[in-house]
Amino acid sequence: MVIERIKHLASPLQDWVFTPSPKVMFDRQLIWIALGLMLTGLVMVASASFPISTRLTGQPFHFMMRHMLFVFLALSISSIVLRIELNKWLKYSSHLLLISLLLLAAVLVVGKSVNGAARWLPLGIFNLQPAEVAKLSLFVFIAGYLVRRHGEVRDSFRGFVKPLLVLITLAFFLLMQPDLGTTVVMFVTTIAMLFIAGAKLWQFIALVMGGISLVIVLILAEPYRMRRVTSFLDPWQDPFGSGYQLTQSLMAFGRGSWFGEGLGNSIQKLEYLPEAHTDFVFAVIAEELGFVGVCLVLCLIFALVFKALLIGRKCLAHDQRFGGFLAFGIGIWFAFQTLVNVGAAAGIVPTKGLTLPLISYGGSSLIIMSVAVSLLIRIDHECRVYLANEPPRSENEEQK
């Protein structure tokens, strides 16, 4: 009797796990990948933040407990977002962008300043970073614009320029904080989405060259950015000054070797490496889990990116353009931000202050990226429902 009761209670979970993928109306693998990354992030934040948490608060697991709260908020908000139909996102994409602009303007007036950058709005439980909201809002808006003005983007320069004006407006507010890293992520993702939508190659090349030129000017205009570039080119020239963070990160990579020092055994996190639990958590992963652990984490992230690109291609192939463009945008965003974060930790690119998706400590980043994953799941779900309800094609149509 008890066994039958247990089987009855477990049957929904059994169906969820063992039902063949073609019959399921959502991507289970995508959920497991995202949860795996979030669990990895929780473990690594607990390990990397232990020393600084003890010094600042007297509680060794202070940042871990806050990160657990962020994970709970992220999963709760994502479960709500998952129920919102895509046509609602398309309909209110302009409103979402306007809210982001207002938040970016507000942070310049009443924002909390950390290390000379005013990027956060204090909300009690956590500090909201409007730049993270602006990323997702922009990509949703661009996807909606590409649906409404697809022909104009492909055929006229005017249609190509309009979304760039929105990007320039957001970039202005971001650079006032200042936040060049988020601006670069938005720029790269936007031009990639326009290119996928059919923008002309010469427009794409001209925009890339213009963007590179602008970044160079912005670097030369600010001494602290120039110091980051020079320290990136030769960090050992000033290992206790401008090159300190990068040299400590490189030492973490060197200590990790193939299999790492073991979970919790990092030396660099003992307040030698600044931002060990946030922007440079990947260096702690490299030191504690080694080359093998680094490869496993990167495989998880790029599996998520690959899933996003597959979902985008499937949607576009079946004329689900809003979901398709948005899925491509999310995939490119995750991929580029990962490359920049990992590249900064490994000394391949200058430090940009970007988080490692779903892993680094930070409430705004974790919540917004979790919402992005839930959007991917929703996009895939609606595409599967559309294909399930699509009338079978006739033999004549298949021959054509």
From Swiss-Prot:
Enumerate the HAMAP family for this protein: PGT_FtsW_proteobact
Record key words, sorted:
Cell cycle, Cell division, Cell inner membrane, Cell membrane, Cell shape, Cell wall biogenesis/degradation, Glycosyltransferase, Membrane, Peptidoglycan synthesis, Transferase, Transmembrane, Transmembrane helix
Lipid bilayer topology: Multi-pass membrane protein
The record's similarity note reads: Belongs to the SEDS family. FtsW subfamily.
Swiss-Prot/TrEMBL catalytic activity: [GlcNAc-(1->4)-Mur2Ac(oyl-L-Ala-gamma-D-Glu-L-Lys-D-Ala-D-Ala)](n)-di-trans,octa-cis-undecaprenyl diphosphate + beta-D-GlcNAc-(1->4)-Mur2Ac(oyl-L-Ala-gamma-D-Glu-L-Lys-D-Ala-D-Ala)-di-trans,octa-cis-undecaprenyl diphosphate = [GlcNAc-(1->4)-Mur2Ac(oyl-L-Ala-gamma-D-Glu-L-Lys-D-Ala-D-Ala)](n+1)-di-trans,octa-cis-undecaprenyl diphosphate + di-trans,octa-cis-undecaprenyl diphosphate + H(+)
TM spans (from-to): 30-50, 61-81, 96-116, 123-143, 156-176, 179-199, 201-221, 291-311, 322-342, 357-377
Main localisation: membrane
- What EC class is this? transferase
Q: Which GO terms describe its cellular component?
A: cell division site; plasma membrane
Can you say what this protein is called?
Probable peptidoglycan glycosyltransferase FtsW
State whether keyword Transmembrane applies: yes
Provide the protein's localization. Answer: Cell inner membrane
Q: Under the GO molecular function aspect, what terms does this record hold? A: lipid-linked peptidoglycan transporter activity; peptidoglycan glycosyltransferase activity
Q: Which gene encodes it?
A: ftsW
